[in-house]
Amino acid sequence: MPKMVHRSKTRPVRVGDLVIGGNNEVIIQSMTTTKTHDVEATVAEILRLEEAGCQIVRVACPEERDALALAEIKSRINIPLVVDIHFNYKLALMAIEAGVDKIRINPGNIGRREKVEAVVTAAKAKNIPIRIGVNAGSLEKHILEKYGYPTARGMVESALHHIKILEDLDFHDIIVSLKASDVQLALEAYQLASESFDYPLHVGITESGPLRTGSLKSAAGLGAILSRGIGNTVRVSLSADPVEEVKVAKEVLKSFGLAANAATLISCPTCGRIEIDLMAIAAEIEDYIDKIQVNIKVAVLGCAVNGPGEAREADIGIAGARNEGLLFRHGEIIRKVPEATMVEELKKEIDAIVLEKEAEKEAAKASQA
């Protein structure tokens, strides 16, 4: 598997049963598209996100009826619940009382100091962290006047101002995000932030667009940020089904060796040498391994030129030949199979390797107990 990219060490912050920062893995987050007060729809969407591999989910809370739904939602899901709060500090207090795992606020729009202090006091009492969410599109007026337009320095200045509000109240369970729709601006802001404080960073490119273009833009931005060892949680923001956000995030993390429990598919580009329906087989195997939660690399190659030698790092793979397929493990051919059954044979081998790796994980856990 790819070597894990080094991530800048940050202060560990507990969110539910996860720890963000420190030397812990990068966590995938998404956000629901439902009205939060519609409990059935919201829970159903969160369960779909869980199945896709989402590890933390955020919900909007613009109204009191949304806050009143949080306790029931929390009781019916299996991952940490984060609540987005703007302007009304009483909604933050209700969310904390409901037992959510984190709140996302901008201390600058909550109101007077005593309102911020009330939120922080409640969060401290319940050991609930706060994410400070800075957005290039909504910087404070005095910062825009100072810099003329959104800049990385202005975004970090805003973050530091909000951090100080919380630190002055002796609150340190803080996570920070500095989002922009411009990739270069986001990259510069996160780089400067990583040099300015040690709180964990939630990274993403905001308002990145619909599925195809948004995925590409997010991959470019997140890839650049992660390659510098920056980022503790990620969200891919798409104008699409949030399940797609999770899928894209997983692929980005896998590209950097940062997905500890996911399967990776490699497949060759098509050319005139292929003897099998490569595109259909690759798509079928990609779907088959989508929910696997162990480290495994699978290869689907169109001919013997590209495989098995060029995919020797794969745990299991298949290379097409005329009327047959060559099954191989770590570059070594294990057997030939008829073309008609090679996909099913590959799936059987994948299943066997998954069982092996799951047994190894359990044995490792037992040895540490």
UniProtKB/Swiss-Prot annotation:
Pfam families: GcpE. It catalyses: (2E)-4-hydroxy-3-methylbut-2-enyl diphosphate + oxidized [flavodoxin] + H2O + 2 H(+) = 2-C-methyl-D-erythritol 2,4-cyclic diphosphate + reduced [flavodoxin]. The keyword Flavoprotein does not apply. Keywords: 4Fe-4S, Iron, Iron-sulfur, Isoprene biosynthesis, Metal-binding, Oxidoreductase. The keyword Iron-sulfur applies. [4Fe-4S] cluster binds at residues 268, 271, 303, 310. InterPro entries: Dihydropteroate_synth-like_sf, IspG_bac, IspG_bac-typ, NO2/SO3_Rdtase_4Fe4S_sf. Its EC number is 1.17.7.3. Coiled coil: none annotated. Binds 1 [4Fe-4S] cluster. It is an enzyme of class 1 (oxidoreductase). Its cofactor is [4Fe-4S] cluster. One of its GO terms (molecular function) is 4-hydroxy-3-methylbut-2-enyl-diphosphate synthase activity (flavodoxin). Pathway: Isoprenoid biosynthesis; isopentenyl diphosphate biosynthesis via DXP pathway; isopentenyl diphosphate from 1-deoxy-D-xylulose 5-phosphate: step 5/6. GO terms for biological process: isopentenyl diphosphate biosynthetic process, methylerythritol 4-phosphate pathway; terpenoid biosynthetic process. NCBIfam families: ispG_gcpE (TIGR00612), PRK00366.1 (NF001540). Converts 2C-methyl-D-erythritol 2,4-cyclodiphosphate (ME-2,4cPP) into 1-hydroxy-2-methyl-2-(E)-butenyl 4-diphosphate. Belongs to the IspG family. This is 4-hydroxy-3-methylbut-2-en-1-yl diphosphate synthase (flavodoxin). It comes from Exiguobacterium sibiricum (strain DSM 17290 / CCUG 55495 / CIP 109462 / JCM 13490 / 255-15). The lineage of its organism: Bacteria, Bacillati, Bacillota, Bacilli, Bacillales. The gene is ispG.
